[in-house]
A protein has these predicted regions:
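Hydrophobic transmembrane alpha-helices and their immediate loop junctions
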Residues: 1-394
């Protein structure tokens, strides 16, 4: 669900000033054929060279990575005014366990928690026979929901992992997060052990997860809606997931307008696809370390923080607008209005306090994003709008 930077376990010891000066001279000799050096500076253990590149940034980065590694440094290319800065940072080793026991255990526990959650979604008439049979069969009624949701999340994480390895970024295996409520999971995270090489690589790693997950979610919702049915509405009312523009359109194309007094009873596979769309939409918020935040950085560079803050402000405004609209629609019922608009405030709060607005830049922050990737980035932002439900549960 989210690419989370790993916490450093051990950083190369900060060398004494005299050693830094010696290293600075060695690094300068390895930079001079790549950068016409106009200025150099030592900031603690960081050595900065400023000037004009003599070759294109991607090639410069490849050369400098190999040249700096023997000295225990890694290069970062930055634009500073009208000059290019080559920053040499000490190498860091990150605490990403190489054993996969924890990954496997969390995956198994998450499978069980989503299976239990799936029992609450097995109310479709399709499962009448299962509900009438043994306890074991009733328990297995949670499989369609659990299998579908885990497939969406698993392929999402696999998209991140495979793309990161292809782009030579060091990442961990996914850590799935079980939950005793809701859908039975809070998604998964992948720990990054190294920065992305450039904006294209950063974009590929970020966008691969949501797009891969949607490649499973769309067939799932088509099948789920095909197996859903329109039934009479129960006398006491019912609780249902709120529609996004995407899910409403797909349901309308399948069933047309629902007659008064009837409701759509969705198959658990459709419920799991709905959950997959929601998780993907939340991940595409252009904020911080979320997939959408990485896409925003690749698209807009240093403006990504302003975009993230504007996104949170927009969520709060939508929350206030939703509350006022529902307050009027319910005849002044403040509790009902707050319940209908609470999701906007929760999303804004979680993003602000748990995700934040910081993003680790790539090694090469000079090379622009390719036009094709810019188009895919716009598609991802459109998908966010289409998949985000104004009301989660009504």
């Amino acid at each position: 669900m989210r690419l989370w930077p790993a916490r450093p376990r051990r950083r190369s010891a900060v060398p004494p000033p005299e050693d830094v000066l010696v290293t600075e001279e060695q690094l300068r000799r390895n930079v001079e054929d790549v950068l016409v050096v106009r200025d150099r500076q030592v900031r603690g253990s960081v050595v900065v060279f400023r000037g004009v590149l003599t070759i294109e940034p991607r090639r410069a980065l490849e050369l400098l990575i190999d040249r700096f590694r023997p000295f225990g440094y890694t290069p970062f290319l930055r634009q500073e005014g009208d000059t290019v800065a080559v920053q040499a940072w000490p190498l860091a080793e990150t605490a990403v366990p190489r054993r996969i026991g924890v990954n496997v255990l969390l995956f198994v526990v998450t499978c069980l928690s989503t299976l239990v959650a799936g029992l609450s979604f097995a109310g479709s008439p399709t499962f009448d026979a299962l509900r009438a049979s043994s306890s074991a069969a009733r328990f297995l009624a949670g499989l369609p929901f659990a299998f579908t949701l885990m497939a969406i999340l698993g392929v999402h994480e696999l998209g991140h992992y495979v793309t990161a390895r292809y782009d030579r970024a060091a990442v961990s295996l996914p850590y799935f997060i079980p939950a005793p409520f809701g859908f039975g999971t809070l998604g998964a995270i992948i720990l990054m052990r190294s920065p992305a090489r450039d904006r294209n690589s950063l974009f590929d790693i970020a966008a691969a997860g949501p797009l891969a997950g949607l490649a499973v979610a769309f067939p799932a919702i088509f099948l789920g809606l095909a197996w859903s049915s329109v039934v009479p509405m129960p006398p006491g009312g019912y609780t249902a997931f709120g529609d996004s523009a995407l899910t409403w359109t797909l349901a309308y194309l399948r069933f047309g307008p629902i007659p008064p007094g009837y409701m759509l009873f969705t198959h658990p596979m459709a419920d799991a696809a709905w959950a997959g769309f929601l998780v993907t939409a939340l991940n595409l918020f252009p904020v911080g370390q979320l997939d959408g935040g990485r896409i925003a950085y690749a698209l807009f560079g240093r403006y990504h923080r302003a975009i993230g803050k504007a996104t949170v402000s927009a969520l709060l405004l939508f929350g206030v607008g939703s509350f006022l609209w529902n307050f009027r629609a319910t005849g002044g019922d403040a509790f009902a209005a707050l319940a209908s608009s609470l999701n906007w405030f929760v999303w804004a709060g979680l993003i602000s306090f748990l995700v934040g607005f910081h993003h680790t830049p790539p090694l090469d922050d000079l090379s622009p994003l390719s036009p094709g990737r810019r188009l895919v980035g716009v598609v991802c932002l459109v998908l966010l709008v289409l998949m985000l439900p104004p009301v989660v549960i009504h």
